[in-house]
Amino acid sequence: MIITVDGPSGAGKGTLCYALAEKLGYALLDSGAIYRVTALAALQRKTDLTNETDLAELARHLDIQFIPQNGEVSILLAGMDVSRLIRTQEVADAASKVAVFQKVRSALLQLQQDFAKNDGLIADGRDMGTVVFPNAQVKLFLDASAEERAKRRYKQLQNKGINGNFAQILAEIKERDFRDRNREVAPLKPADDALLLDSTTLSIDEVIDQALAYIQRXGISFRFNCLFKEE
C-alpha cells in the first residue's frame, strides 16, 4: 500500500507524513530530503548548480541512508548524519534549483521507487502522486497560502532563537513556488485523483484527522496511535 502526500514547502507535509507513518506502521519516504542531500553534496563539492550533467552524475553515485532513531529518521550521506545540515535555507534553495533538471530527477527516481518494496509506504514530496508513484492507492495534496507558510517558517526560526526577516522569507517562498510550479519537468501540481487539503486555517490535528478519515474510507486500518512532532 502506497500513500502519497504532495504539496509546496511549509504546507505541513512533514508533520502529516510522520503522523500517518506512525499511525499506520508504514515506512516513510521524504523525497525532499533526497533532493536536499543531493544539493548539500553539490555545495560541499562546489559543483555548479546550473550544470545538469555534473549534477546528475553526482546524484547517481550518492550513498544515502534513512535510519529510524528515537522516533525520528536520521539521514546519512556517505555514513555521516546530515539531518540538520540539509534543513538550512541555503540547502533548501539549492535543492529547488537542482530539482528542475530532468537528468537529476531520472537519476534519483529509482532510488525513490525502491522504497515501494516496503509493505506500506508514506511518500512525501512534490511529484509522488504524479510521477514517482502514479498508481498509489491513496493520494493527498496538502497546500496553504504563501503568507501562512511564511508565518510558520518565521515562527520556527524564532523558536530556535534565530531572528528571521518575514518579508524575505515570504519572498523566498513565493520564488520557490514559482520555480516548482512552472518547471518543465515534473511541475508541482496535484494528481487528478488526489484529495486536496488546504491547511491555511487548520491546525495540524485537523489536517491529520481529515487525512485519516479519507484513508479509512479507502479501507486502510490503523495499527497503533501516533505521536506528533513539529515539522
Swiss-Prot record:
A GO molecular function term, named singly, is:
(d)CMP kinase activity
- Kind of enzyme, top EC level? transferase
Give me any GO biological process, just one. nucleobase-containing small molecule interconversion
The gene designation is cmk1
Q: What is this protein called?
A: Cytidylate kinase 1
Q: Which reaction does it catalyse?
A: CMP + ATP = CDP + ADP; dCMP + ATP = dCDP + ADP
Lineage summary: Bacteria, Pseudomonadati, Pseudomonadota, Gammaproteobacteria, Pasteurellales
Question: PANTHER family under this entry?
Answer: CYTIDYLATE KINASE, CYTIDYLATE KINASE/PANTOATE-BETA-ALANINE LIGASE
The EC number of this protein is: 2.7.4.25
NCBIfam families, alphabetized:
cmk
Question: Hey, which family's this protein in?
Answer: Belongs to the cytidylate kinase family. Type 1 subfamily.
Keyword entries, A-Z: ATP-binding, Cytoplasm, Kinase, Nucleotide-binding, Transferase
ATP-binding among keywords: yes
A Pfam family that this protein carries is Cytidylate_kin
Q: Which InterPro entries match?
A: Cytidylate_kin, Cytidylate_kinase_dom, P-loop_NTPase
Record: residues binding ATP = G7, P8, S9, G10, A11, G12, K13, G14, T15
Where in the cell does this protein reside?
Cytoplasm
Q: What is one GO cellular-component annotation here?
A: cytosol
